[in-house]
Each structure stands twice: as C-alpha cells, then as structure tokens.
Amino acid sequence: MIKVDNIPETSDVKPEVSRPYLNIKPIESMSDQEAADFISKEFEDAHEVAEFDTYDKLLSEVFNRSEDEISIDFSLSDKIKEILEEFHFDKWETMSEAERVDSIKELAKAVGDALELDAIPAIDIVDGDDSYGFYDPKNNTITLNSNYFSDPIELVNTLTHEMRHAYQHMRAEVLETWEDALYKVNFDNYISPMPLPGGGWLFFVDYFDQYVEVDARAFANKFTETMV
C-alpha cells in the first residue's frame, strides 16, 4: 500500500530519508516495463483497499435501521392528493373493480412521474394468499393482491412502498449519491424472510430493519398519513 503520510516538508531532504516510499520501490533488475507494471499494481492495490473500506462503511449503514432515521425529500403534489381522494373509504366502496384498477394505475403513474422513474412499473392484479404485493425489478412490474383491496389505505401503502422499491432499483444502477450506493449494497446483501412450518417468519426483523425496506416504509407513510 502506498503511504503518503509523515513526509518531511524540507526541500533538502536526502533520498535515503524519504522512507515512506521505500516499500514500493521496484528492484534494480526490473526493466522499465516491469517497473511501470509494479507501480501500477501498487496503485491498484491501494484503490482496492479504499474500495473495501467504503463498502464496509456502506454495509454498516444498511442494517438495523429505523424509520425515524430516514428523511425523504418528497412532497405530495396537488395531482397526487387529488388522486388519493379516490382511495378514501366512502368513495372507494362505491367504485367498481374496473374503476379501482384505473385509480391504482393513475396513482402509480403520478408517483412514478414524481420520482422521475425511467419507466412506470406495470400493475398486475392477482388473487393471492398472504402477501400484500411485491415489486419485480426484472420485469418492472408491481403485483398487488386483490384480497386486500377492501382496505384502501393499506392498498395505497403497498403500492407506494413498491413504487419506492422501483425507484431504489433505478438509483442503484445510477450510483450518483451515497444513498444510491446504500441501495446497491443493500440489494447485493438483501435479506428475505423465510416462512416457518408452524407459522411466522425466520429473519423477519433483519428483513424489516434493512435500509431499503425502512426507506420504502417511510416513503409510503407520506401518503397514508394524509388519509387518516
């Protein structure tokens, strides 16, 4: 590793005193090309060490997180607020299934536009079991369980939560900010809960408290807190 600290500042230092660089000095029998390759490798090794240090720092910020640590710079537009009116219970219970699906897709598009997503996820409605919904990054689709459509607040919570996951995956590919890197590292080390035979989940707390899940919940709260 290249050392750059503790270098004397005087201009008349004898060569043998500049010891910090002696550990990367190529042997005298090396050719010019071998010496160049040697120095290049030293720089590469130093860069890898720096990358490992950064990765460890990111990893330390991924797990054991809570929503009160997350600050999301996002405000609901008038358009989004207007669409959310469709999900208030008195209105929602009078709507047909087709009208509900239209409102879901309209909200997804409005949120996706606000998040500046490259592509709005397709909405897939299924008659599922115990899952509210999920986002599939490979196909850019959000699957929603129609069995929970009777609760419009929970539906909005699920939809916006999964829309945030779509945003996270997009930003993890861009990698322009520290938060983008957090998304990337978390997805690379994502913890999924495992169902237990007798009911319940294994690793649920680890799943629940990882950064991308905490961030998605905090984002969804911005919508549901206006509906209660």
Name each model feature, range by range:
Residues E97-A119:
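Zn2+-dependent metallopeptidase catalytic core
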Residues A119, T177-V228:
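Metalloprotease/metallohydrolase-associated module, dominated by Zn2+-dependent proteases
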Residues M163-E179:
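Catalytic Zn2+-binding segment of zinc metalloproteases
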Residues S71-A98:
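A short, surface-exposed helix-loop junction/capping segment
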Residues D151-Y167:
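Short alpha-helix carrying the canonical HExxH Zn2+-binding catalytic motif
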Residues K14, E28, A36-H47, D56-F63, ...:
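Residue-level detector of alpha-helical secondary structure
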Residues M1-V17, K41:
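Non-Sec secretion/translocation targeting segments of pathogen effectors
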Residues A114-T143, Y148-I153:
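Catalytic zinc-binding patch centered on the HExxH motif and its immediate surroundings
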